[in-house]
Protein backbone atom coordinates (compact mmCIF):
# COMPACT_ATOMS: atom_id res chain seq x y z
CA UNK A 1 0.00 0.00 0.00
CA UNK A 2 1.91 3.12 1.25
CA UNK A 3 5.32 1.52 0.80
CA UNK A 4 4.44 0.41 -2.74
CA UNK A 5 3.22 3.93 -3.63
CA UNK A 6 6.38 5.56 -2.27
CA UNK A 7 8.48 2.97 -4.06
CA UNK A 8 6.60 3.58 -7.32
CA UNK A 9 7.01 7.37 -7.02
CA UNK A 10 10.69 6.90 -6.21
CA UNK A 11 11.15 4.70 -9.25
CA UNK A 12 9.47 7.27 -11.56
CA UNK A 13 11.62 10.11 -10.24
CA UNK A 14 14.77 8.09 -10.37
CA UNK A 15 14.13 7.04 -13.97
CA UNK A 16 14.07 10.68 -15.01
CA UNK A 17 17.27 11.53 -13.07
CA UNK A 18 20.74 12.06 -14.37
CA UNK A 19 22.10 8.75 -13.07
CA UNK A 20 20.92 5.57 -14.73
CA UNK A 21 19.30 3.45 -12.02
CA UNK A 22 17.12 0.40 -12.07
CA UNK A 23 14.80 -0.16 -9.10
CA UNK A 24 13.47 -3.60 -8.27
CA UNK A 25 10.66 -3.63 -5.70
CA UNK A 26 9.96 -6.67 -3.64
CA UNK A 27 7.70 -7.25 -0.68
CA UNK A 28 8.98 -5.30 2.30
CA UNK A 29 12.22 -4.10 0.72
CA UNK A 30 13.57 -2.04 -2.25
CA UNK A 31 16.64 -3.06 -4.29
CA UNK A 32 18.41 -0.22 -6.21
CA UNK A 33 20.94 -1.03 -8.95
CA UNK A 34 23.27 1.91 -9.70
CA UNK A 35 25.72 2.13 -12.53
CA UNK A 36 28.49 4.74 -12.26
CA UNK A 37 31.65 4.66 -14.38
CA UNK A 38 30.82 1.27 -15.85
CA UNK A 39 30.51 -0.21 -12.41
CA UNK A 40 27.23 -1.62 -11.16
CA UNK A 41 26.36 -1.64 -7.50
CA UNK A 42 23.28 -3.09 -5.83
CA UNK A 43 21.80 -1.42 -2.81
CA UNK A 44 19.07 -2.93 -0.76
CA UNK A 45 16.83 -0.50 1.05
CA UNK A 46 14.42 -1.95 3.51
CA UNK A 47 11.09 -0.20 3.45
CA UNK A 48 9.19 -0.55 6.64
CA UNK A 49 5.51 -0.97 6.19
CA UNK A 50 3.47 1.32 8.22
CA UNK A 51 1.32 -0.60 10.58
CA UNK A 52 -2.29 0.27 10.31
CA UNK A 53 -3.57 1.37 13.64
CA UNK A 54 -7.21 0.47 14.37
CA UNK A 55 -9.50 3.38 14.82
CA UNK A 56 -11.52 3.32 18.03
CA UNK A 57 -14.88 4.99 18.31
CA UNK A 58 -16.13 6.44 21.58
CA UNK A 59 -19.52 5.32 22.84
CA UNK A 60 -21.71 8.26 23.79
CA UNK A 61 -25.07 8.18 25.52
CA UNK A 62 -28.13 8.46 23.35
CA UNK A 63 -30.29 11.52 23.55
CA UNK A 64 -32.98 11.19 26.24
CA UNK A 65 -36.40 10.29 24.84
CA UNK A 66 -39.04 13.03 24.96
CA UNK A 67 -41.60 12.78 27.72
CA UNK A 68 -45.13 12.01 26.50
CA UNK A 69 -47.58 14.90 26.58
CA UNK A 70 -51.25 14.50 27.48
CA UNK A 71 -52.20 15.19 23.87
CA UNK A 72 -50.02 12.38 22.54
CA UNK A 73 -51.20 8.81 23.24
CA UNK A 74 -48.82 6.48 25.04
CA UNK A 75 -48.92 3.87 22.24
CA UNK A 76 -47.66 6.31 19.57
CA UNK A 77 -45.00 7.58 21.99
CA UNK A 78 -43.70 4.05 22.65
CA UNK A 79 -43.77 3.30 18.92
CA UNK A 80 -41.70 6.42 18.09
CA UNK A 81 -39.30 5.64 20.94
CA UNK A 82 -38.80 2.07 19.66
CA UNK A 83 -38.22 3.41 16.12
CA UNK A 84 -35.64 5.91 17.43
CA UNK A 85 -33.85 3.08 19.29
CA UNK A 86 -33.84 0.90 16.17
CA UNK A 87 -32.58 3.76 13.97
CA UNK A 88 -29.87 4.62 16.52
CA UNK A 89 -28.86 0.96 16.77
CA UNK A 90 -28.80 0.63 12.96
CA UNK A 91 -26.63 3.75 12.54
CA UNK A 92 -24.30 2.52 15.28
CA UNK A 93 -23.98 -0.89 13.60
CA UNK A 94 -23.32 0.79 10.21
CA UNK A 95 -20.60 3.02 11.66
CA UNK A 96 -18.97 0.08 13.40
CA UNK A 97 -19.02 -1.91 10.16
CA UNK A 98 -17.46 1.01 8.25
CA UNK A 99 -14.72 1.34 10.84
CA UNK A 100 -14.00 -2.40 10.94
CA UNK A 101 -14.21 -2.95 7.14
CA UNK A 102 -10.49 -2.20 6.63
CA UNK A 103 -9.37 -4.26 9.58
CA UNK A 104 -9.15 -7.98 10.07
CA UNK A 105 -12.30 -9.96 11.01
CA UNK A 106 -10.86 -10.65 14.45
CA UNK A 107 -10.56 -6.91 15.17
CA UNK A 108 -14.25 -6.06 14.69
CA UNK A 109 -15.91 -4.31 17.59
CA UNK A 110 -18.79 -6.20 19.25
CA UNK A 111 -22.16 -4.53 18.87
CA UNK A 112 -24.02 -3.22 21.88
CA UNK A 113 -27.28 -4.85 22.85
CA UNK A 114 -30.54 -2.98 23.15
CA UNK A 115 -30.52 -3.45 26.93
CA UNK A 116 -27.11 -1.77 27.18
CA UNK A 117 -28.28 1.18 25.11
CA UNK A 118 -31.35 1.45 27.34
CA UNK A 119 -29.11 1.45 30.42
CA UNK A 120 -26.96 4.20 28.88
CA UNK A 121 -30.09 6.24 28.17
CA UNK A 122 -31.29 5.68 31.73
CA UNK A 123 -27.93 6.87 33.09
CA UNK A 124 -28.12 9.99 30.92
CA UNK A 125 -31.64 10.69 32.15
CA UNK A 126 -30.50 10.20 35.75
CA UNK A 127 -27.69 12.72 35.26
CA UNK A 128 -30.13 15.18 33.68
CA UNK A 129 -32.53 14.70 36.58
CA UNK A 130 -29.73 15.30 39.10
CA UNK A 131 -28.80 18.51 37.27
CA UNK A 132 -32.42 19.72 37.22
CA UNK A 133 -33.13 18.74 40.86
CA UNK A 134 -32.75 22.38 41.98
CA UNK A 135 -35.61 23.46 39.69
CA UNK A 136 -37.95 20.89 41.27
CA UNK A 137 -39.33 19.57 37.98
CA UNK A 138 -41.45 16.45 38.10
CA UNK A 139 -41.08 15.71 34.40
CA UNK A 140 -37.41 14.71 34.77
CA UNK A 141 -38.31 12.34 37.63
CA UNK A 142 -41.04 10.84 35.47
CA UNK A 143 -38.52 10.36 32.63
CA UNK A 144 -36.08 8.62 34.97
CA UNK A 145 -38.82 6.34 36.28
CA UNK A 146 -39.87 5.60 32.71
CA UNK A 147 -36.29 4.77 31.73
CA UNK A 148 -35.84 2.54 34.75
CA UNK A 149 -39.14 0.88 33.95
CA UNK A 150 -37.92 0.17 30.42
CA UNK A 151 -34.90 -1.77 31.61
CA UNK A 152 -36.79 -3.33 34.55
CA UNK A 153 -34.52 -2.01 37.33
CA UNK A 154 -37.31 -0.85 39.63
CA UNK A 155 -39.29 -4.09 39.49
CA UNK A 156 -39.31 -6.03 42.76
CA UNK A 157 -39.10 -9.78 42.39
CA UNK A 158 -40.64 -12.16 44.92
CA UNK A 159 -37.86 -14.39 46.26
CA UNK A 160 -39.95 -16.55 48.60
CA UNK A 161 -42.57 -18.53 46.65
CA UNK A 162 -44.04 -19.95 49.87
CA UNK A 163 -44.75 -16.55 51.44
CA UNK A 164 -48.34 -16.07 52.60
CA UNK A 165 -49.74 -12.79 51.31
CA UNK A 166 -53.12 -11.60 52.66
CA UNK A 167 -55.79 -11.40 49.98
CA UNK A 168 -57.21 -7.93 49.33
CA UNK A 169 -60.68 -9.39 48.64
CA UNK A 170 -60.97 -12.54 50.75
CA UNK A 171 -64.00 -14.79 50.40
CA UNK A 172 -65.59 -15.22 53.84
CA UNK A 173 -65.92 -18.87 54.82
CA UNK A 174 -68.82 -20.14 56.99
CA UNK A 175 -66.37 -21.10 59.73
CA UNK A 176 -64.97 -17.56 59.99
CA UNK A 177 -68.12 -15.59 59.25
CA UNK A 178 -68.51 -14.53 62.87
CA UNK A 179 -64.90 -13.26 62.92
CA UNK A 180 -65.24 -11.27 59.69
CA UNK A 181 -68.50 -9.53 60.70
CA UNK A 182 -68.14 -7.57 63.97
CA UNK A 183 -71.08 -6.52 66.12
CA UNK A 184 -72.89 -3.23 65.30
CA UNK A 185 -71.95 -1.77 68.69
CA UNK A 186 -68.27 -2.49 68.06
CA UNK A 187 -68.44 -0.83 64.64
CA UNK A 188 -70.05 2.31 66.05
CA UNK A 189 -67.58 2.56 68.93
CA UNK A 190 -64.41 1.61 67.06
CA UNK A 191 -62.50 4.13 64.95
CA UNK A 192 -60.46 3.85 61.75
CA UNK A 193 -57.16 2.94 63.44
CA UNK A 194 -58.81 0.31 65.62
CA UNK A 195 -60.35 -1.26 62.52
CA UNK A 196 -56.90 -1.46 60.92
CA UNK A 197 -55.50 -3.11 64.05
CA UNK A 198 -58.34 -5.65 64.06
CA UNK A 199 -57.76 -6.46 60.38
CA UNK A 200 -54.00 -6.92 60.97
CA UNK A 201 -54.69 -9.17 63.96
CA UNK A 202 -57.19 -11.14 61.92
CA UNK A 203 -54.68 -11.55 59.12
CA UNK A 204 -52.03 -12.75 61.56
CA UNK A 205 -54.49 -15.15 63.13
CA UNK A 206 -55.48 -16.52 59.73
CA UNK A 207 -51.81 -16.88 58.85
CA UNK A 208 -51.16 -18.85 62.04
CA UNK A 209 -54.21 -21.02 61.39
CA UNK A 210 -53.11 -21.70 57.83
CA UNK A 211 -49.63 -22.67 59.04
CA UNK A 212 -51.15 -24.96 61.67
CA UNK A 213 -53.41 -26.56 59.05
CA UNK A 214 -50.45 -27.06 56.70
CA UNK A 215 -48.38 -28.57 59.54
CA UNK A 216 -51.28 -30.86 60.47
CA UNK A 217 -51.69 -32.05 56.88
CA UNK A 218 -47.95 -32.67 56.56
CA UNK A 219 -47.77 -34.62 59.84
CA UNK A 220 -50.85 -36.70 58.97
CA UNK A 221 -49.33 -37.46 55.58
CA UNK A 222 -46.07 -38.53 57.26
CA UNK A 223 -47.94 -40.82 59.67
CA UNK A 224 -49.99 -42.32 56.85
CA UNK A 225 -46.91 -42.92 54.74
CA UNK A 226 -45.10 -44.54 57.67
CA UNK A 227 -48.14 -46.75 58.36
CA UNK A 228 -48.31 -47.76 54.71
CA UNK A 229 -44.64 -48.74 54.74
CA UNK A 230 -45.11 -50.75 57.94
CA UNK A 231 -48.23 -52.37 56.49
CA UNK A 232 -46.29 -53.41 53.40
CA UNK A 233 -43.56 -54.92 55.61
CA UNK A 234 -46.14 -56.75 57.76
CA UNK A 235 -47.94 -58.08 54.69
CA UNK A 236 -44.66 -59.35 53.29
CA UNK A 237 -43.75 -61.06 56.59
CA UNK A 238 -47.22 -62.62 56.79
CA UNK A 239 -46.93 -63.95 53.26
CA UNK A 240 -43.53 -65.49 54.04
CA UNK A 241 -44.85 -67.19 57.18
CA UNK A 242 -47.93 -68.55 55.39
CA UNK A 243 -45.77 -69.84 52.58
CA UNK A 244 -43.42 -71.55 55.03
CA UNK A 245 -46.35 -73.17 56.89
CA UNK A 246 -47.91 -74.40 53.66
CA UNK A 247 -44.59 -75.82 52.52
CA UNK A 248 -44.11 -77.67 55.85
CA UNK A 249 -47.67 -79.03 55.71
CA UNK A 250 -47.23 -80.26 52.16
CA UNK A 251 -43.93 -81.89 53.12
CA UNK A 252 -45.52 -83.61 56.13
CA UNK A 253 -48.44 -84.68 54.00
CA UNK A 254 -46.04 -86.23 51.53
CA UNK A 255 -44.32 -88.06 54.37
CA UNK A 256 -47.69 -89.21 55.73
CA UNK A 257 -48.69 -90.41 52.30
CA UNK A 258 -45.50 -92.40 52.04
CA UNK A 259 -46.02 -93.90 55.52
CA UNK A 260 -49.66 -94.66 54.75
CA UNK A 261 -48.69 -96.38 51.54
CA UNK A 262 -46.07 -98.43 53.36
CA UNK A 263 -48.52 -99.33 56.17
CA UNK A 264 -51.21 -100.30 53.68
CA UNK A 265 -48.79 -102.45 51.77
CA UNK A 266 -47.65 -104.12 54.99
CA UNK A 267 -51.24 -104.72 56.07
CA UNK A 268 -52.10 -106.25 52.73
CA UNK A 269 -49.08 -108.53 52.98
CA UNK A 270 -50.11 -109.61 56.48
CA UNK A 271 -53.65 -110.34 55.34
CA UNK A 272 -52.40 -112.40 52.44
CA UNK A 273 -50.03 -114.31 54.70
CA UNK A 274 -52.79 -115.01 57.25
CA UNK A 275 -55.13 -116.22 54.55
CA UNK A 276 -52.47 -118.47 53.13
CA UNK A 277 -51.74 -120.00 56.54
CA UNK A 278 -55.45 -120.43 57.22
CA UNK A 279 -55.87 -122.28 53.96
CA UNK A 280 -52.98 -124.54 54.84
CA UNK A 281 -54.40 -125.29 58.30
CA UNK A 282 -57.84 -125.85 56.85
CA UNK A 283 -56.44 -128.29 54.33
CA UNK A 284 -54.54 -130.23 57.00
CA UNK A 285 -57.60 -130.39 59.26
CA UNK A 286 -59.72 -131.60 56.36
CA UNK A 287 -57.19 -134.31 55.65
CA UNK A 288 -57.19 -135.46 59.29
CA UNK A 289 -60.99 -135.53 59.31
CA UNK A 290 -61.10 -137.67 56.20
CA UNK A 291 -58.58 -140.08 57.61
CA UNK A 292 -60.48 -140.54 60.86
CA UNK A 293 -63.81 -140.98 59.10
CA UNK A 294 -62.33 -143.67 56.86
CA UNK A 295 -60.91 -145.53 59.88
CA UNK A 296 -64.28 -145.46 61.66
CA UNK A 297 -66.02 -146.85 58.58
CA UNK A 298 -63.41 -149.59 58.27
CA UNK A 299 -63.88 -150.69 61.94
CA UNK A 300 -67.64 -150.62 61.57
CA UNK A 301 -67.45 -152.91 58.55
CA UNK A 302 -65.12 -155.25 60.42
CA UNK A 303 -67.47 -155.48 63.44
CA UNK A 304 -70.35 -156.09 61.16
CA UNK A 305 -68.52 -158.87 59.53
CA UNK A 306 -67.43 -160.49 62.79
CA UNK A 307 -70.75 -159.90 64.54
CA UNK A 308 -69.27 -158.59 67.66
CA UNK A 309 -70.63 -155.49 69.33
CA UNK A 310 -68.31 -152.60 69.90
CA UNK A 311 -67.04 -152.04 73.42
CA UNK A 312 -67.98 -149.01 75.49
CA UNK A 313 -64.45 -147.56 75.20
CA UNK A 314 -63.97 -145.73 72.07
CA UNK A 315 -60.95 -145.85 69.88
CA UNK A 316 -60.59 -142.11 69.91
Swiss-Prot record:
Q: Where is the composition biased (Low complexity)?
A: 125-135
Q: In which tissues is it expressed?
A: Expressed in roots, leaf blades and leaf sheaths. Expressed at low levels in stems and spikelets.
Post-translational modification remark: Phosphorylated by BRI1. Phosphorylation reduces the binding affinity to BAK1.
Q: Where is the composition biased (Acidic residues)?
A: 40-53
Q: Where is this region: Disordered?
A: 1-108, 125-202, 267-287
Q: What else is known?
A: Plants over-expressing REM4.1 are dwarf, with dark-green, short and wide flat leaf blades, short panicles, spikelets and grains, narrow bending angle of the lamina joint, and short leaf epidermis cells.
Q: What is this protein called?
A: Remorin 4.1
| Annotated organism of origin | Oryza sativa subsp. japonica (Rice)
